[in-house]
Amino acid sequence: MYKFRIQGSDKPLSGEVTISGAKNAALPILFAALLAEEPVEVANVPKLRDVDTTIELLQRLGAKVSRNGSVHIDASEVNNFCAPYDLVKTMRASIWALGPLVARFGKGQVSLPGGCAIGARPVDLHIHGLEQLGATIKLEDGYVKAEVDGRLKGAHIVMDKVSVGATITVMCAATLAEGTTILENAAREPEIVDTAHFLNAIGAKVSGMGTDTITIEGVERLGGGYHEVVADRIETGTFLVAAAVSGGKVVCKNTKASLLESVLAKLEEAGAKVESGEDWISLDMTGRELKAVNIRTAPHPAFPTDMQAQFTLLNMMAKGPGIITETIFENRFMHIPELQRMGAHAEIEGNTAICGDTDGLSGAQVMATDLRASASLVIAGCIAKGETIVDRIYHIDRGYDKIEDKLTALGANIERVRSSEL
């Protein structure tokens, strides 16, 4: 087991950071490669624990996978149609194997998934979508089992609620369905758009991605192709917040402002100077006063729930108060008690947190509770007075590619240490 040991400083975090590919696009794209009868190459895939788990799962299913810069996948000889519990238990994204398996092979089963403990994220919407495409679904022995005689059938589907995961499942499965599928009330996130671009690169006919109505014209087979994963907008936002709360200046490279317009608008409202070009975003907080902002999470293009914890920290350190309202997940304020251990000011009322006017943070031993919350603890440690130990950093490794190296390049004093060394 590893932990982060951070020596806090009042020195601003400043410099350049290269943003990795988006985890939330890379994972569905890697699973969607199961649809392809010929080899595919996926570039700009981040080096993350969840990516490693996905690659191992694809290999268990019979795909040939290698990584040499890009990830190369040959799913032409897939011969196992079951995603087992020992892999799925660590990663909720494993459910994305089900749609491609049943669409291409007529059958598939996936153990009920695990992942971050941030509330109920049931697979009901995935199941209902596949059933509307003609699949028969059973829940047996802890597995979701899907079958279809012949091909799936295109359908007009109206999602009961906006769901990124279920939108991806239905969109991928419908590519090999007979006929046209119209998916209404679809999620609009950039990662869904990127997954659709990958599907089209291997021969699918997907249109309307990025709107709430996606149209998929089914084809008989999908071939091979090349795709480069879109930049990680959440990693981008995380480093921009790190600069903002430390009074620094950072340039994020290999990313695009169009991916996180709602986040950039709130950073400007908080007092930061934000500029951008074709493939970079800069934030300058030098000599500026940090002001608390009101945040309400909602599906894209509104403010993303995955940036909520980082802005909770920003509000705590700003001239406040600022109100954070979480509408996507329940139980997503687990980072607040940990930040309070460091001296942060916040009050929680249901799905709302009121925070601001914290007079500095003090280093403490804190525990990462989920992926994005853990990032806020790491940033807090960088700006706190004294030493901070962040435990259970495997959560961070699920979504951030070498976060300690990138923070070190910005001037942070952070190291990964074995628990036995502390």
From Swiss-Prot:
Record-listed 2-(S-cysteinyl)pyruvic acid O-phosphothioketal modification sites? C116
Q: Which GO terms describe its biological process?
A: cell division; cell wall organization; peptidoglycan biosynthetic process; regulation of cell shape; UDP-N-acetylgalactosamine biosynthetic process
Q: Where is the signal peptide?
A: none
Cite the binding residues for UDP-N-acetyl-alpha-D-glucosamine.
R92, R121, P122, V123, D124, L125, K161, V162, S163, V164, D306, I328
Q: Where does phosphoenolpyruvate bind?
A: K23, N24
Q: What is the top-level taxon of the source organism?
A: Bacteria
This entry carries the following GO cellular component terms, namely:
cytoplasm
Under the heading Pfam families, the entry gives: EPSP_synthase
* Transcription found in the keyword field: no
EC class: transferase
Query: What Gene3D superfamilies does the entry give?
Result: Enolpyruvate transferase domain
Which InterPro entries does the protein's record reference?
Enolpyruvate_Tfrase_dom (IPR001986), Enolpyruvate_Tfrase_sf (IPR036968), MurA_subfamily (IPR050068), RNA3'P_cycl/enolpyr_Trfase_a/b (IPR013792), UDP_GlcNAc_COvinyl_MurA (IPR005750)
Family (UniProt): Belongs to the EPSP synthase family. MurA subfamily.
Protein task? Cell wall formation. Adds enolpyruvyl to UDP-N-acetylglucosamine.
What protein name applies here?
Answer: UDP-N-acetylglucosamine 1-carboxyvinyltransferase
